[in-house]
Amino acid sequence: MRLFAGIAATAILIAACGGTAAVSTPTPTASPSPTPVPTVANTFKAELKAANENPPITDAEATCTGTATVTFTATSAKFDVSITGCPATTAINIGHIHEGAVGVNGAVKIDSTLKAGDITLTGGAVTFSRTNSAADPAIITAIMANPAGWYVNFHSTAHGGGVIRGQLTKA
């Protein structure tokens, strides 16, 4: 009987306090989702001309022209290139982005990954794309800040220093 009286007294006390004998559990809260990292994509263009080379091209390959569209992400550079007007014997071997203002020759900073023999001009023209997936983010940032300080340059067998060149501009 004493046991019954003790249980009854405890139940009355709990009821008087407005509580229940059940233990409350906290409501779980959802963890916040990680913030997605934005993908930076910026597109630049260059009008490629033999006359832009330093020194300018004055032989038969002076007729070569083209356009390059370069699209950057945080760590890559995609080159979309069209070259026209070249003599049938022209062989475009390599291409890249150099640091340098108009009329100033500078160091290669981002390679297009084009290698000798990768492309063949037909009727003096070619269109191709290449992507460098390992471009230096610091160089990409510098190009975005001042595209005029950078140029696209494609080289031929006859002109190892470059046959067509153009400064980058925001597309």
Could you say what each language-model-derived stretch is?
Residues 1-7:
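Bacterial N-terminal signal peptides that target proteins for export
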Residues 7, 12-13, 17-95, 99-171:
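Metal-centered catalytic cores of metalloenzymes
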